[in-house]
Amino acid sequence: MKAIKKVLNNIFIDGLSGMALGLFSTLIIGTILKQIGDLMGGTYGTYLSAFAVVAQRLTGAGIGIGVAYKFRESTYVLLSAAAAGMIGAYASNLIAGTLLSDTGALVLSGPGEPLGAFVAAYVGITIGRLVAGKTKLDLLITPAITILSGGAVGILVGPGVSSFMTWLGNLVNWGTEQQPILMGIVVSVIMGMVLTLPISSAALGIILGLNGVAAGAATIGCCCQMIGFAVTSFKDNGVGGLFAQGIGTSMLQIPNITKRPLIWLPPTLASAILGPIAIIGPFHMTNNATGSGMGTSGLVGQIMTYQTMVATESPVLVILKIVVFHFLLPGLLSYVIYRGMRNMGYIKDGQMKLSV
């Protein structure tokens, strides 16, 4: 039982956290820079957009390095995981014979499959670790084993796993369109809680390919957690805690949640209330997969929401909706619930004090 728990923690906590590091450093920042470059135009804008595309295409490598770094792997395993991740990311292209042109040039269309990159990198790292430092030919053996094992599994398993997760994501997207109230609650609450837990909601949103109102509900849930904790814990943590949680991460509250689970209730109830409201009727908040699990962290969720919604709505209206549903209402609703629970004695001063 302990062995199973260790493997699950390895994959879903450390592994996905490492995957998120890679995603932030390539796909997510590349998407933001691409938008800025396109808005700038001209020579400098063109260069910036080109830099962004390079970053996006290296998503698989970033994931491989991020996972290996999180596992504290040796140098050769860490660097070789980049190649394994790239093979896994573009496994479908490799199988289809479209990865190389007739002249032998590498053709990288899009960022590839993030989950395929994770699977290939994880297997390559796990097997590469077994031989790292064990032979006098470590310089050759470890990179070769890491790349070959990860790449092979990436080709064999990656496309199938990615297809299943895409199917599951499409099911969530479709279900949210059909039943926005029920699914709005479910998606908003689950993604918000995942964001606060030591699991990467950003990686989950991208793996599932959330989009449209499903991604909109997911973003609301994440915003409620971050802004909710930032506001409700202000008395305990002041301005520093406000920014650390509001544009950093609500994961900082995990030690306190473990001791006092009731402090998690205000932002979670806010997610359940605002998630469906924000995606129905005239509000129709949407987002893309990249921003769906980011909340207000680095304002990535807001940038992606703007990019997604401005195509069909006026910029001023989109910004107004973002301010109201991503900041004002999550903070206000969480605070109202928090005050009620505090007055009833369920939450007390000092229970949300951060130790950092």
Where are the regions that the model predicts?
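Pore-lining transmembrane helices
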Residues: M1-V356
